Amino acid sequence: MMTVTNQARCEQHYEQRYEQWAAPLRGRPGVVRALNIVNHGIVVVFYAAYALLLGWACVSDPWKLAPLVGVTAVGFAAVSFFRRRFNAPRPYECCSIAPLIARDGAGKSFPSRHTFSAFAIAASWFVASVPIAVVLLVAAVVLAVCRVLGGVHFPRDVVVGALIGSATGALAAFLAVLL
């Protein structure tokens, strides 16, 4: 268990590290605006990518929908449940940082559900198109970086979200191939 002193030291260390990452961006409003646009834009891309994947499954073999929807939904629900139970604070709550991405609300930081969803969708695409899956994996990494640079997640939040999302998407794709 982490003591208050160790936790304070850890938070101070993260504040310093975050400011090293964010300082070059803070002085450039256009870059901060671009960070927010990329963050939001990639989320929209993943909504569309998931809809297209499900459309592809409907056309190619409707049985593929079961794992592509079911496994992803179970993973999403499990991550959401864990986030509520664990209720980890966000960086701007426990550290003295000013996030570059505006976000209302508190807690539920671990793991990152945006990152989970992006990696789950990207990995699921391997059943339909490897090149699209690879492009989406790159976009998922960019989203994870945006969430950390934006100050709304700690690196551990996005790493764990990426791992769980990748495993969920890989399982969904594997089961879809079997059908």
Identify the meaning behind each predicted range.
Residues 52-78:
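Interfacial segments of alpha-helical transmembrane regions
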Residues 44, 48-51, 71-75, 161, ...:
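Hydrophobic alpha-helical membrane-embedded or membrane-associated segments
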Residues 96-179:
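Membrane-embedded catalytic cores of phosphoryl/pyrophosphoryl-handling enzymes
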Residues 47-56, 138, 170:
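Hydrophobic core of alpha-helical transmembrane segments in multi-pass integral membrane proteins
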